[in-house]
Amino acid sequence: MESTVMPGFDRISELPESLISQILLHLPTKASVKTSVLSTRWKNLWLNVPGLDLNCRDFPFQNNNEKLLIDFIDRFLQFNNESRLQKFKVDYSRDKIIKFSDRIGDAISRGIRVLDVESNTYYRDADDCIDYPCIEFMPLNLYSCKTLVSLKLSYSGLEDPGFVYLPCLKFMHLREVRWDSSGTMNLEKLVSGCPVLEELIYLHDDKLVVTRVRSRSLKRFSIPFRHKLSLFRRVTQTFEIDAPGLEYMSLKADHFDRIVVKNLTSLFMIDLDIKFIVGFGWMFDPEDLPKRNEIRDFLTGISSVRHMVISHNTVKALDLYSKVGLIPKFNNLSRVEAAFPSSLLQFLPAFLESFPNLKHLILETECPVEVMEKFELVNVPRCFVSTLEHVEIKGLFDWGEQDMKIASYFLENSAVLKKLILSFMGCPQHYSESDIYEELNKLTKRSPRCQIIIRC
């Protein structure tokens, strides 16, 4: 029997106001304000929402007059001023707003759980006509907020409060924050005051010589890709992480001249896109002994990892390093996803030799932009004999000699291989699937039960 809905029947309005407020909390404040026109009951419901999510571009600024925005925030904070707030999110990447940090401080004092502030504002110097960031330092009560669970700051200033204690903070995302000029406030001091911190995403400030993270609670750490690189770095920068509970780490691009890892004994997964040198298109000098020692110590420090994702940049760096140093064994590693440049396929056996217990391999090949030199895959890594069960070769464009050579290398040498997957970016132009199957089935498979799968 089909159910019918009475015309004009509003199920949402029948919900309790407390539940409606929680629903509106997940919308931008601009959207929740619009609900005030629905009916008399909805007129002030948005003021009961336990949080703000504002973009200052939604307010009409005239002659740098920020009064409308400030009045809006003040009205919201004063309404039910004894109730707790759950979230305060604001993007004021437009003009500097006088005493805006006071409003942030008011929100913090209301027991917020989520603080998300982006303050990417600039001023133009009249003398040199260069744009400089306007730094809005966070209020001091931020550093002792007992309710804060998630903190995200972009282009904000952090000064030394003397003491940091954020007992509930689990998630922290800092994007190019500015530390005060005293030199006593830094990432290490901030993290040390977060006893239950689990996730840290950090895009650094170019002015710090050493950036250090020490945490026993930290489980996930990421340095994301940075779209704008500084062309005028004044100092050589070192990054150091000491986190015995860390399970996941992602390093996406070379923001630091030197990386030091310590006590990463719980590391499960790592995602690497680094070359161990700062500079677009640069590669490190294999004759640089301190750099070789740094790479050796880094690889040894992450060698307990179980799952690795590795970019073509890092593969190139490892190939360079392998000519002058020994890549350590990753005895716990069972899964690897590697983007492999076609020009470095000769390095593939030595690369896989470092993973003696590898079970799953996803190999993304890159189409050669020029005629490749002949290469031979001769040496058989240890994992081929006893552990390698699943191989996927991705990024295939057409079926050629190089692709056949890679596929036959795995089929003819892997003793326990269960599945070989060939993933094409489209349909091969010059071969049908049946042609490829026929060619591969002529090979002598070392593992007779290996299944070949073609994906187009």
Swiss-Prot record:
User: Mind telling me which Pfam families this protein's record contains?
Assistant: F-box, FBD, LRR_At5g56370
Q: Which UniProt keywords apply?
A: Leucine-rich repeat, Repeat
Which top-level group of life is the source organism from?
A: Eukaryota
Q: Which InterPro entries match?
A: F-box-like_dom_sf, F-box_AtFBL13-like, F-box_dom, FBD, FBL13/AtMIF1-like, LRR_dom_sf, LRR_FXL15/At3g58940/PEG3-like
Map the LRR repeats onto residue numbers.
Answer: 197-220, 243-266, 302-325, 355-379
The UniProt record lists the keyword Repeat: yes
- Outline the extent of the F-box domain: 9-55
Residue span(s) of domain FBD: 372-424
PANTHER family assigned to the protein according to its UniProt record, in alphabetical order: F-BOX/RNI SUPERFAMILY PROTEIN-RELATED (PTHR31900), PROTEIN WITH RNI-LIKE_FBD-LIKE DOMAIN (PTHR31900:SF33)
The protein's name is: F-box/FBD/LRR-repeat protein At1g13780
Tell me the organism: Arabidopsis thaliana
